[in-house]
């Protein structure tokens, strides 16, 4: 199949005003997408965005392009990425468009598409859109132009959808929860969801100004929520990223619960209820501790390449339901078509209530192994992944680690860097082994 030139594995993304992220290209992209999508039955598209100041710019450009191609546009304003996927289905739109750069700083932005069923757009459709980009922009006749409307009740619809994943017979009454919205798209959603389910909510990262998304808050910057959980004597914390598709949690002692441990909680809960279908999909970066803990429960575990798109591919291939990344992308296909941080948090809270257990108790039997990642630059045409010196160092370390350790070597896709990841039982040894392999890479001539 022809390779995509414009779309990456998760749409397009970059610095605003440079490369692909310009208003000119957004206008043309809206038109090209409209041309392709108009070949199907439903002539309407939903657009949502996060809280970056540039969201207004790209929203206007996309809606103009789509209208010029004859498609109606429904604007839902700042909304989490999974909300766009859900609302695309419920409004029976032909596609959903998200304007977001997820966990990146405010000066980046991105554009990605959902199909009418709320899943990522097929590669074939993205290739069709790319083909239209090469053509001159032409406008449909005036009477065929698309209409643009704003949907005022989108937030309320999504709040009710999220609450629907929590058992009706349960309540969060008595729980004090810190919710970090990363000054992002969940700022007006997540606190309301958990409050309406009965919890006492302390919200942080809930005052976006267009420039502070993901700035020292959210799932990629856990310091503030850990401090707040301890200072407020809260039962737990839930941290989301800028577009709401990732989650990290914090227990009452201020310890971070990452995506691997969340996957473990959900898999164990599903197994106990007799609803676990198959096993769990992680990634190459998933901690070996998750693998070993699931083995102890006879739950199959497989690894995909890094990226929620690849996790989804393996889930579909195996016909399994639960998968995700240690970074907090959690997929549960019984509860949605894409990663949803709020829903994943609700499912963990439901497991706590069902089992009358704390986060500490639910994670007591999974021991995360020390993991060290070293980025090392290599020069010239030497490929460290085929170097006998590097491979010998890797084999030596693997022999020393045995079954209780793992070595992963990955090249960066954008610069001459090798990522050396080593995990095992002892922090000191793991650190030494990672630098031993990194030195072998540096010694390549």
UniProtKB/Swiss-Prot annotation:
Entry-linked InterPro entries: A-D-PHexomutase_a/b/a-I, A-D-PHexomutase_a/b/a-I/II/III, A-D-PHexomutase_a/b/a-II, A-D-PHexomutase_a/b/a-III, A-D-PHexomutase_C, A-D-PHexomutase_C_sf, A-D-PHexomutase_CS, Alpha-D-phosphohexomutase_SF
UniProt keyword terms in alphabetical order: Isomerase, Magnesium, Metal-binding, Phosphoprotein
Superkingdom assignment: Bacteria
UniProt key word Nucleotide-binding: no
EC number(s) on file: 5.4.2.10
GO biological process annotation, one example: carbohydrate metabolic process
GO molecular function: magnesium ion binding; phosphoglucosamine mutase activity; phosphomannomutase activity
Enzyme class: isomerase
Any Pfam family the entry gives: PGM_PMM_I
Mod. after translation: Activated by phosphorylation.
Gene3D superfamilies listed in its UniProt record: Alpha-D-Glucose-1,6-Bisphosphate, subunit A, domain 3, Alpha-D-phosphohexomutase, C-terminal domain
Cofactor note: Binds 1 Mg(2+) ion per subunit.
Positions annotated as active site in the UniProt record: 102
GO cellular component: cytosol
Names of the cofactor(s): Mg(2+)
Reactions mediated catalytically: alpha-D-glucosamine 1-phosphate = D-glucosamine 6-phosphate
Modified positions (Phosphoserine) in chain numbering: 102
Family per similarity comment: Belongs to the phosphohexose mutase family.
NCBIfam families: glmM, PRK10887.1
Its job: Catalyzes the conversion of glucosamine-6-phosphate to glucosamine-1-phosphate.
Official protein name in the record: Phosphoglucosamine mutase
């Amino acid at each position: 199949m022809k390779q995509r030139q414009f779309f990456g594995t998760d749409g397009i993304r970059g610095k605003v005003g440079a490369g692909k992220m310009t208003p000119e290209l957004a206008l043309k992209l809206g038109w090209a997408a409209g041309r392709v999508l108009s070949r199907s039955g439903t002539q309407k598209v939903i657009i949502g965005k996060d809280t970056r100041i540039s969201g207004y710019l790209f929203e206007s450009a996309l809606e103009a392009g789509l209208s010029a191609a004859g498609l109606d546009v429904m604007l839902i304003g700042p909304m989490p990425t999974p909300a766009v996927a859900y609302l695309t289905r419920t409004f029976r739109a032909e596609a959903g468009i998200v304007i977001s750069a997820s966990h990146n700083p405010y000066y980046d932005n991105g554009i990605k598409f959902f199909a009418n069923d709320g899943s990522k757009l097929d590669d074939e459709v993205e290739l069709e859109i790319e083909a239209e980009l090469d053509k001159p922009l032409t406008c449909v006749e005036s009477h065929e132009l698309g209409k643009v409307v704003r949907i005022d009740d989108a937030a309320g619809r999504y709040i009710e959808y999220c609450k629907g994943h929590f058992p009706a017979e349960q309540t969060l009454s008595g729980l004090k929860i810190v919710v970090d919205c990363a000054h992002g798209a969940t700022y007006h959603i997540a606190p309301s969801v958990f409050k309406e389910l009965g919890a006492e909510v302390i919200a942080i990262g809930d005052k976006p100004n267009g420039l502070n998304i993901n700035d020292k808050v959210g799932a990629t910057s856990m310091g503030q929520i850990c401090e707040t959980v301890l200072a407020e004597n809260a039962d737990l914390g839930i941290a989301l990223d800028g577009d709401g598709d990732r989650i990290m949690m914090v227990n009452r002692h201020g310890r971070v619960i990452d995506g691997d441990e969340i996957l473990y909680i959900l898999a164990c809960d599903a197994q106990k209820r007799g609803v676990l279908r198959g096993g769990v999909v992680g990634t190459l970066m998933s901690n070996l501790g998750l693998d070993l803990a699931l083995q102890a429960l006879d739950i199959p575990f497989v690894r995909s390449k890094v990226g929620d798109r690849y996790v989804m591919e393996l889930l579909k291939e195996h016909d399994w339901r639960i998968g995700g990344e240690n970074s907090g992308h959690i997929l549960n296909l019984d509860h949605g078509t894409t990663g949803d941080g709020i829903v994943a948090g609700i499912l963990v809270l439901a497991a706590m209530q069902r089992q009358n257990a704390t986060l500490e108790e639910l994670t007591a039997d999974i021991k995360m192994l020390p993991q060290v990642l070293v980025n090392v630059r290599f020069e010239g045409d030497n490929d460290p992944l085929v170097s006998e010196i590097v491979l010998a160092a890797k084999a030596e370390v693997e022999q020393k680690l045995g079954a209780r350790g793992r070595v992963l070597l990955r090249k960066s896709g954008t610069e001459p860097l090798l990522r050396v990841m080593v995990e095992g039982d002892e922090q000191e040894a793991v650190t030494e082994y990672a630098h031993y392999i990194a030195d072998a890479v540096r010694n390549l001539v």
